[in-house]
C-alpha cells in the first residue's frame, strides 16, 4: 500500500490518460492540465482508456514516486470527464485500489451461522 501521512489529499485526474507516460510526464500533466503543484505531497491518480489500470504519483519530500495497479477483473470506477479534477479521501482511494465502487461502498454479506 502507499505510505501516506494523515491529511494527504488525493486528486483524480478525470478522463483518460496515456498510460505510456512516466512520472515526469505525469507530473507535467498535473502542473499544466490540472494547475496544481506535483511536489506538494498530494497524491494524483490517473486512469487509462481501458479502465483496468491506474497510476498514482506523489512527492514525499525526498523524491517523486510512481505506483501502478492493474485489475485482473473489472474496471476502476471513474467520474465523467465533465467533472474536472476531483478530490477523494484516502479511504475512497483504498476502496478504489481494491476494485470496489468508491462512490458507494456496500457491505458484503457475512453469514453469522455455519450450517
Go through the PLM ranges and name each one:
Residues 1-115:
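Polybasic/polar functional segments that serve as interface/processing modules
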Amino acid at each position: 500500500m502507499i505510505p501516506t501521512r494523515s491529511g494527504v489529499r488525493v486528486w483524480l485526474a478525470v478522463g483518460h490518460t496515456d498510460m505510456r507516460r512516466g512520472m515526469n510526464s505525469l507530473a507535467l500533466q498535473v502542473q499544466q492540465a490540472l494547475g496544481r503543484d506535483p511536489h506538494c505531497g498530494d497524491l494524483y491518480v490517473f486512469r487509462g482508456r481501458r479502465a483496468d489500470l491506474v497510476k498514482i504519483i506523489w512527492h514525499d519530500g525526498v523524491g517523486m514516486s510512481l505506483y501502478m495497479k492493474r485489475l485482473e477483473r473489472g474496471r476502476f470506477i471513474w467520474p465523467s470527464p465533465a467533472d474536472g479534477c476531483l478530490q477523494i479521501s484516502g479511504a475512497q482511494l483504498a476502496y478504489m485500489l481494491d476494485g470496489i465502487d468508491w462512490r458507494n461502498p456496500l457491505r458484503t454479506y457475512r453469514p453469522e451461522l455455519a450450517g
